[in-house]
Amino acid sequence: MAHTMRVDVVSAEEEIFSGEAEFVALPGESGELGILPGHTPLITRIRPGAVRIKVTGQAEDEFVFVAGGILEVQPHVVTVLADTAIRGGDLDEAKAAEAKQLAEEALVNKESKIDYAQAQAELASAIAQLAAIQRLRQKR
């Protein structure tokens, strides 16, 4: 029997994934993190990007886009508390591309009454969504 861990991915709106997994990869604040069962306890912030979950007994990995959040790792439990989370199959490329364009325009428009940090965060999130869509396509 393979070693597994419980993985929960939740956002403020809903639980996106809950189940047993053999491996989780996600974008940590300092770079890509790979988590296996028995990992040392860890709490860290996560950047916008794709969470890849190797689900026990499934040939295909699960993908979830997160727009940042917190990761908590215990030896046999991984919890992702995401600001926003979207299942890989629910990502909308046209919507993400439009959000990217709007954020870029807001950053260029000096007369705009926008919060610069907010526009940068929206741009980073849109770029990460588009990258997650590309990764998902490559796996198919």
Curated annotation (Swiss-Prot):
It is found in: Cell inner membrane. It is a peripheral membrane protein. It comes from the Bacteria. GO terms for cellular component: plasma membrane; proton-transporting ATP synthase complex. GO terms for molecular function: ATP binding; proton-transporting ATP synthase activity, rotational mechanism. Keywords: ATP synthesis, Cell inner membrane, Cell membrane, CF(1), Hydrogen ion transport, Ion transport, Membrane, Transport. HAMAP family: ATP_synth_epsil_bac. F-type ATPases have 2 components, CF(1) - the catalytic core - and CF(0) - the membrane proton channel. CF(1) has five subunits: alpha(3), beta(3), gamma(1), delta(1), epsilon(1). CF(0) has three main subunits: a, b and c. Produces ATP from ADP in the presence of a proton gradient across the membrane. Belongs to the ATPase epsilon chain family. This is ATP synthase epsilon chain. It comes from Janthinobacterium sp. (strain Marseille) (Minibacterium massiliensis). The gene is atpC.
